[in-house]
């Protein structure tokens, strides 16, 4: 089997280390079922979300990478990942039903396969489920001669993933430049909202220099103003036809993932902004269904950095309460911060430090439970290996408790972006590790 190609931002994986307390599939699934039933019977549990179990995934073949994990309106879980074939790549999808007495995976389905995909450790495909039962997915496809010319292919399934629409290129006209770092939300029962980072204005500037290649890496992002990446948003109907598109911010960080959540006052999108003097702090915009607010800072960290840190913010919401988690080095050291808003993002309380020090890698994922806020992030060990950590907090971001989820064999950026979700009273977490020198997606359930 072929390997998943890596961009120049990636580091090759090292020798594998298995998840701690690895068990056989039947025993593990039985334990998961027991913990689910147990958690349903408890109103308050001082040890909630500290009991870690291996979660067997359908990603049994290697290599597999770039996982995404989402909760459906029926409280099921959708897991997607990318794996290679002999000549191309395919986006795989499976559904997990944690609500049953015996949790199980549905048969894996292929969303799409093809050549010429753009695969990157941070800019990964996403899946989503709307209340009308439809499933949506996207991946990145090369669109031009340059390595960084790629666009967003969007598809929809109305039959549970058995069949999919023809891919729709979100950036119309197959415009050159890079377009990615997508976030999805439900705008209506049958309407998908999405936001992404878009380089059309930078591509126009670049085209003025004939023959100049359009490249970017972790330290190459030194543009701003009309030569900067921008944030755009759009809505799509059940026919995968665009029903509006908006420029949301004309100057953003180049390759930090975006995130979104729905409040009672509309959808909030968070992302890393970029000022003319290279201040790259977390910003927020909100959409009420008709208009978008102007960008505003979640907090004025005043982190000045000439290159993109590839470390975007994440957000969850309930009612008009928002929680945002982000990475910064504004005080001279790697730090993971969180802040809460109780007015749908108009104002935020002072940020809380979740983790700080040279070991903090960030790449946070965020989920909300009935009584807790859960945050997963990566840290680096002294031997350059990595570990995956889960932090549990109350809704005021107080009373912290941390638990180690796994020791990873992979190093650098090959570990990708962890994905954390809460469904049926338990937390579910997936990430990329290595096995026999190849990337593989692993999982854990936390009860």
Region roles according to the model:
Residues 42-447:
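Extracellular, repeat-based ectodomains that mediate carbohydrate processing or recognition
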Residues 5-7, 219:
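Exposed, low-complexity/repetitive linear segments and helix-based recognition motifs
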Residues 37-40:
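C-terminal motif of bacterial Sec signal peptides marking the signal peptidase cleavage site
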């Amino acid at each position: 089997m072929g390997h998943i190609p890596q961009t120049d931002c990636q580091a090759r994986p090292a020798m594998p280390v298995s998840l701690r307390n690895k068990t056989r599939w039947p025993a593990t699934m039985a334990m998961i079922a027991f913990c689910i039933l147990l958690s349903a019977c408890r109103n308050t549990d001082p040890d909630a979300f500290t009991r870690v179990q291996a979660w067997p995934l359908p990603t049994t073949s290697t290599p597999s990478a770039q996982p995404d994990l989402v909760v459906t309106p029926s409280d099921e879980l959708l897991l997607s990942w990318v794996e290679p074939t002999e000549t191309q790549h395919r986006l795989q999808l499976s559904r997990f039903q944690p609500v049953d007495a015996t949790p199980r995976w549905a048969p894996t389905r292929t969303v799409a396969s093809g050549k010429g995909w753009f695969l990157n450790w941070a800019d990964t495909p996403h899946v989503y489920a709307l209340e009308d039962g439809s499933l949506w997915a996207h991946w990145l496809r090369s669109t031009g001669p340059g390595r960084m010319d790629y666009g967003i292919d969007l598809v929809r399934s109305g039959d549970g993933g058995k069949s999919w629409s023809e891919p729709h290129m979100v950036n119309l006209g197959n415009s050159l430049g890079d377009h990615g770092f997508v976030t999805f939300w439900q705008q209506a029962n049958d309407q998908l909202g999405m936001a992404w980072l878009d380089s059309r204005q930078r591509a126009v500037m670049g085209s003025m220099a004939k023959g100049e290649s359009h490249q970017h890496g972790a330290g190459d992002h030194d543009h701003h103003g009309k030569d900067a990446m921008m944030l755009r948003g759009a809505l799509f109907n059940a026919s995968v036809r665009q029903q509006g598109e908006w420029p949301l911010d004309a100057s953003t960080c180049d390759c930090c993932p975006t995130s979104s959540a729905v409040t009672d006052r509309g959808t909030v999108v968070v992302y890393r902004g970029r000022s003319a003097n290279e201040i790259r702090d977390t910003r927020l915009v909100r959409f009420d269904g008709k208009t978008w607010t102007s960008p505003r800072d979640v907090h004025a960290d005043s982190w000045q950095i000439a290159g993109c840190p590839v470390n975007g913010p994440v957000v969850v919401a309930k009612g008009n309460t928002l929680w945002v988690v982000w990475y910064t080095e504004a005080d001279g050291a790697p730090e993971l911060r969180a802040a809460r808003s109780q007015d749908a993002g108009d104002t935020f309380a002072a940020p809380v430090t979740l983790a700080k020090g040279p070991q903090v890698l960030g790449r946070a994922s965020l989920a909300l439970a009935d009584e807790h806020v859960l945050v997963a992030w990566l840290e680096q060990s002294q031997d350059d290996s990595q570990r995956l950590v889960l932090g549990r907090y109350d809704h005021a971001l107080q009373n912290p408790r941390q638990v180690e989820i796994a020791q990873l064999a992979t190093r650098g950026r090959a570990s990708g972006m962890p994905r954390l979700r809460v469904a049926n009273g338990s937390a579910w977490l997936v990430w990329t590790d290595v096995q026999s020198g190849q990337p593989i997606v692993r999982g854990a359930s936390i009860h």
